[in-house]
Amino acid sequence: MEMASAFTLNVRLDNIAIITIDVPDEKMNTLKAEFASQVRAIIKQLRENKELRGVVFISAKPDNFIAGADINMIGNCKTAQEAEALARQGQQLMAEIHALPIPVIAAIHGACLGGGLELALACHGRVCTDDPKTVLGLPEVQLGLLPGSGGTQRLPRLIGVSTALEMILTGKQLRAKQALKLGLVDDVVPHSILLEAAVELAKKDRPSSRPLPVRERILAGPLGRALLFKMVGKKTEHKTQGNYPATERILEVVETGLAQGTSSGYDAEARAFGELAMTPQSQALRSIFFASTDVKKDPGSDAPPAPLNSVGILGGGLMGGGIAYVTACKAGLPVRIKDINPQGINHALKYSWDQLEGKVRRRHLKASERDKQLALISGTTDYRGFAHRDLIIEAVFENLELKQQMVAEVEQNCAAHTIFASNTSSLPIGDIAAHAARPEQVIGLHFFSPVEKMPLVEIIPHAGTSAQTIATTVKLAKKQGKTPIVVRDKAGFYVNRILAPYINEAIRMLTEGERVEHIDAALVKFGFPVGPIQLLDEVGIDTGTKIIPVLEAAYGERFSAPANVVSSILNDDRKGRKNGRGFYLYGQKGRKSKKQVDPAIYPLIGAQGQGRLSAPQVAERCVMLMLNEAVRCVDEQVIRSVRDGDIGAVFGIGFPPFLGGPFRYIDSLGAGEVVAIMQRLATQYGSRFTPCERLVEMGARGESFWKTTATDLQ
């Protein structure tokens, strides 16, 4: 049976050809290798029709132009040569579109990313809608790749090399107004007139490329170029710590094209694409992409979710304010905040105002849209307006009796169907539900701070939580823009449980004499966004260490923190950045102030600050304990799969994405090698490094957690 075409051609009476992109049976348009023959057949028809005045590419999908190339194509390549051939095929197709003798215009609405933007760049002009869904970018670097269908060559020539490098090196996505300002698109119009605006542009001569700003012209010259690439190279190396080979290759390929011409540039692009596709970093990053896509499709349980029309929040603090923001402004649901103190309500409302006003200032949002979203949030000091809320999120202090009281009050003041979701980070959900009249409607919903930035939530059913409660809570988390993983109701859940030994070990090394900045730098070099000591300061030392006694009581000595160190720090009124002093000292500008290590920290904890360990030795000690605990979590079914474990670690604590998560990292080293390292560390530093039974068994059998492909579990 012949495959339905993703590209269809219709010629209007005014002799403008409309090519409609609509990949059959898919929500998103993605480019596949087999579409090349369809596009070539259309190009042949266009060339044969001498009456044509212009061509418009437009999508039939409601909210995307082309979201990128189908990543499975890369996974199917077995060698760098095969991946290189894939890139050359894409380059050739784009060249054929660009070589058409009549104006070719891309009419863009929704996501125009990766190969989609490369197709738009191959057109002679671009018009996009002013809709918030419309974004343009080249995110390939986030998969350990570079744009392989001409993007590294066309974009710098269109918008200037420094602006193009920023887009390609970061995967940054532009909104319509930004794209227009930079010259990436020629016009921005309402969605209702997109096609007509593109047709009008197609009837004119090919749009002439607008002159680049003087700065960009200087940077494109030999002297400016040398300086630019040196500066950007240094900045990129500092940011990536050499862990992401794609960034280095992007710089090399863009510079080749500018210095030696487009022919050499395209050649370098295809070659680099092929080589990068085979790197372990790209394979790991693609595995994270597939796993997160998979998690987002997972309903959490087999039961259908209940309707979600409105949400209540108990507590207007930092977490409550953040949860209110994502519920109203991302999920679009009415939110009612209850706080015993009117100040708490004001704080929560101001939090959302600040977030939205920032978007208005950056021109990402209209003032009218800001007001519309803010109108979804209201507050009260009692339970007025809570009677018909479908789900209540509790974000009060970490106190069991208080949370049990909240359950009782919600059951008394809300509807019989109302779900109670606790944002606890350490208390067992079963204990919170112990006196509930409807325990099947009690669940944990653990957000991470700052709520609006952290993509992960843990959803924690206790033994009596119903399947529908799980499904409804998962549905809410997805509407809030979060990636949810369902975890078992055991102390620390998953993320905090694997994080605690990692932080404990960092503190232990401090007491042994390692310096704060050396420990943090070692873990940043390993690939974490910040080091463990800085992380503790950012979270708040009081908040971050509260869970350690809970974990020690549940799991024993391996979770014990170095004696008296935490209490010494807290007794000295050191809470971290929030009060200006922790392991680091902070200036007066709050979150934006620069930090420096406080030398007084060493005598306070009885340490010398004269360490002897190398950076890899420091990282090894912290990371091995995290890996061991992650394997225990699989063994005890705290997480449902290693997929969830990898996603939880990468999205919840910033485990290096280029390693693919704890389980993929164990596979890359080999379970046997991890066991050998841990046994050596156990001999040197104590029994907390003893590898767990599951890891030892897997090492002995030569087993791995994942199959060899990026998408399949063992």
From Swiss-Prot:
Pfam family name, one: 3HCDH
Species of provenance: Shigella sonnei (strain Ss046)
Family annotation (NCBIfam families): FadJ, PRK11154.1
Record-linked InterPro entries: 3-OHacyl-CoA_DH_CS (IPR006180), 3-OHacyl-CoA_DH_NAD-bd (IPR006176), 3HC_DH_C (IPR006108), 6-PGluconate_DH-like_C_sf (IPR008927), ClpP/crotonase-like_dom_sf (IPR029045), Enoyl-CoA_hydra/iso (IPR001753), FA_oxidation_alpha_subunit (IPR050136), FadJ (IPR012802)
Subunit structure, as described in the record: Heterotetramer of two alpha chains (FadJ) and two beta chains (FadI).
Entry protein name: Fatty acid oxidation complex subunit alpha
Protein family membership: In the N-terminal section; belongs to the enoyl-CoA hydratase/isomerase family.
Function: Catalyzes the formation of a hydroxyacyl-CoA by addition of water on enoyl-CoA. Also exhibits 3-hydroxyacyl-CoA epimerase and 3-hydroxyacyl-CoA dehydrogenase activities.
Keywords annotated in UniProt: Cytoplasm, Fatty acid metabolism, Isomerase, Lipid degradation, Lipid metabolism, Lyase, Multifunctional enzyme, NAD, Oxidoreductase
